């Protein structure tokens, strides 16, 4: 079969990265091979994010650039590429995408992209403006192909999708649907596959991954803790992680597992969004700051070395200076290793967008600057505390310099070392940390590994 080129540009979360890999796997049997050169692509897929307005508008900006590429092809007498908008912008905006960008051929949601081969074949037969936004989570997981392209040393596996929490700022329940978990056998089989292909580390993915409740042997329902213990038995799998978690789903078994399972890394992303009880209630987060502090304390009791990460939103409607100070207070009390912070972005269709007490943009910007200064200071302090220590680093990619490779610590810090023959790629190695910056560490190979 003559190969055709497939170009995928991915926006947003790790789930989208995973979905893009699965799209490659879906289309490979039909003769489509991935390319990083958009100009040679027969099919162009934008796998999109709708979590913030800026992310959504990036899709339309990129589509404008693709339109110019299509026009150039036409002038040169070349065939046009098939253009697909996939992911959460597709789910949220649907037919509006065809109105704004009529040259798009296919709009497909995150729960129905397994139909891409059929949709693309219809476009080849000159059908236009095809759309599939069905919410059938069971069908998606049942239709996902087995891995064809190795993910490398670190692999993502989707185990849970959707969200039932309905935070008032968030589009996920509307774009990804209700919470649904893959069955244990599917997850275990995929984990065996990626490990046999060379993965040393697996990151389990879900919008609310710690709400996982998949069906296991004898129809037993497995919690996330059960699933992690099951996967930890796989030979040659050395590291396990999971993302993203909701505080209210951090149950006792999962917290205890952080203290008993050595393959479960001592790093947890646990978004809190705000430190103000008033704002947490307005966000419909279903917990208060005291509950969050209790979870953090219990995690640190179970595993004293655990390092935490979080998400924060500043400028949610009704946020006062006092509310913002509560957020700063929470940050200073918890002390994070790294964090992500954003200005509130009203999303159409969410309750937050209809609130009348929106915060002026300049105040959002001021608060974000103050918060990020605090978070960056904490991140730098944590990185600097690692200097002089020996850390186990999983090397997974080349650096920008010819003799450089990059790995990550158990705490998700990037570590740069000199390794001219690249002999340590794919290995976990003891590295002495010699230097720290805000975003990375520098290290040296211990004599025993030379």
Swiss-Prot record:
Q: What is its EC number?
A: 2.8.4.3
Name the CDD domains for this protein.
Radical_SAM
Write down the species. Rickettsia massiliae (strain Mtu5)
Residue ranges occupied by any MTTase N-terminal domain in the UniProt entry = 4-125
Q: Where is [4Fe-4S] cluster 1 bound in this sequence?
A: 13, 49, 88
Q: What are the top taxonomic ranks of the organism?
A: Bacteria, Pseudomonadati, Pseudomonadota, Alphaproteobacteria, Rickettsiales
Regarding protein family, the annotation reads: Belongs to the methylthiotransferase family. MiaB subfamily.
Instruction: Tell me how the cofactor is bound.
Output: Binds 2 [4Fe-4S] clusters. One cluster is coordinated with 3 cysteines and an exchangeable S-adenosyl-L-methionine.
One of this protein's Pfam families, by short name? UPF0004
> Which residue range or ranges hold the Radical SAM core domain?
149-381
* InterPro entries attached to this UniProt entry: Elp3/MiaA/NifB-like_rSAM (IPR006638), Methylthiotransferase (IPR005839), Methylthiotransferase_CS (IPR020612), Methylthiotransferase_N (IPR013848), Methylthiotransferase_N_sf (IPR038135), MiaB_methiolase (IPR006463), rSAM (IPR007197), rSAM_horseshoe (IPR023404)
Q: How does it assemble?
A: Monomer.
Gene3D superfamilies recorded:
Methylthiotransferase, N-terminal domain (3.40.50.12160), tm_1862 like domain (3.80.30.20)
Where on the tree of life does the source sit, at the highest rank?
A: Bacteria
What is the documented function of this protein? Catalyzes the methylthiolation of N6-(dimethylallyl)adenosine (i(6)A), leading to the formation of 2-methylthio-N6-(dimethylallyl)adenosine (ms(2)i(6)A) at position 37 in tRNAs that read codons beginning with uridine.
Q: Which residues bind [4Fe-4S] cluster 2?
A: 163, 167, 170
Q: Which PROSITE patterns match?
A: MTTASE_N (PS51449), MTTASE_RADICAL (PS01278), RADICAL_SAM (PS51918), TRAM (PS50926)
Q: Which HAMAP family match?
A: tRNA_metthiotr_MiaB
Which co-factors does it depend on? [4Fe-4S] cluster
GO cellular component terms, alphabetically, are: cytosol
Q: Which UniProt keywords apply?
A: 4Fe-4S, Cytoplasm, Iron, Iron-sulfur, Metal-binding, S-adenosyl-L-methionine, Transferase, tRNA processing
So what does this thing catalyse? N(6)-dimethylallyladenosine(37) in tRNA + (sulfur carrier)-SH + AH2 + 2 S-adenosyl-L-methionine = 2-methylsulfanyl-N(6)-dimethylallyladenosine(37) in tRNA + (sulfur carrier)-H + 5'-deoxyadenosine + L-methionine + A + S-adenosyl-L-homocysteine + 2 H(+)
Q: What is this protein called?
A: tRNA-2-methylthio-N(6)-dimethylallyladenosine synthase
Q: Which SMART domains match?
A: Elp3 (SM00729)
State the Gene Ontology terms under molecular function.
4 iron, 4 sulfur cluster binding; metal ion binding; N6-isopentenyladenosine methylthiotransferase activity
Q: Start and end of every TRAM domain?
A: 384-447
Where is the protein situated, by its record's location annotation?
Cytoplasm
């Amino acid at each position: 079969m003559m190969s055709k080129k497939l170009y995928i540009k991915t926006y947003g979360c790790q789930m989208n990265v995973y979905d893009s890999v699965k799209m490659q796997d879906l289309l490979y049997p039909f003769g489509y091979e991935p390319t990083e050169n958009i100009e040679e692509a027969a099919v162009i897929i934008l796998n999109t994010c709708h979590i913030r307005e800026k992310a959504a508008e990036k899709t339309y900006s990129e589509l404008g650039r693709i339109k110019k590429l299509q026009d150039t092809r036409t002038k040169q007498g070349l065939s046009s590429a098939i253009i697909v908008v996939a992911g959460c912008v597709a789910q949220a905006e649907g037919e509006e995408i065809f109105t704004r960008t009529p040259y798009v051929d296919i709009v497909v949601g995150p729960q129905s992209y397994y139909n891409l081969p059929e949709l693309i074949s219809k476009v080849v037969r000159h059908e236009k403006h095809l759309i599939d936004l069905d919410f059938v989570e069971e069908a998606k997981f049942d239709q996902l192909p087995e891995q064809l392209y190795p993910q490398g040393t670190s692999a993502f596996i989707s185990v849970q999708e959707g969200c039932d929490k309905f935070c008032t700022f968030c589009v996920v329940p509307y774009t990804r649907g209700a919470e649904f978990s893959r069955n244990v056998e599917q997850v275990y089989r995929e984990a065996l596959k990626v490990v046999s292909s060379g993965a040393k580390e697996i990151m389990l993915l879900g919008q609310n991954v710690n709400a996982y409740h998949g069906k296991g042997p004898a129809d037993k329902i497995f919690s996330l803790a059960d699933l992690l213990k099951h996967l930890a038995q796989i030979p040659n799998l050395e590291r396990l992680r999971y993302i993203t978690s909701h505080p209210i789903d951090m149950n006792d078994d999962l917290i205890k597992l952080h203290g008993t399972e050595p393959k479960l890394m001592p790093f947890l992303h646990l978004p809190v969004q705000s430190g103000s009880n008033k704002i947490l209630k307005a966000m419909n987060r279903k917990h208060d700051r005291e509950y969050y502090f209790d979870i953090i304390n219990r995690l640190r009791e179970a595993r004293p070395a655990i390092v935490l990460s979080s998400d924060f939103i500043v400028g949610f409607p009704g946020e006062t200076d006092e509310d913002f100070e509560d957020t700063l207070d929470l940050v200073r009390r918890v002390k994070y290793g790294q964090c992500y912070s954003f200005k509130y972005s009203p999303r159409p269709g969410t309750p937050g967008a209809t609130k009348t007490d929106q915060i002026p943009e300049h105040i959002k910007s001021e608060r974000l600057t103050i918060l990020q200064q605090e978070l960056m200071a904490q991140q730098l302090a944590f990185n600097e505390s690692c200097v002089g220590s020996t850390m186990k680093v999983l090397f997974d990619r080349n650096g920008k310099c010819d003799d450089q490779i990059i790995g990550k610590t158990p705490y998700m810090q990037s570590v740069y070392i000199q390794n001219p023959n690249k002999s340590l790629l794919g290995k976990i190695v003891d590295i002495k940390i010699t230097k720290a910056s805000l975003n990375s560490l520098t290290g040296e190979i211990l004599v025993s590994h030379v």
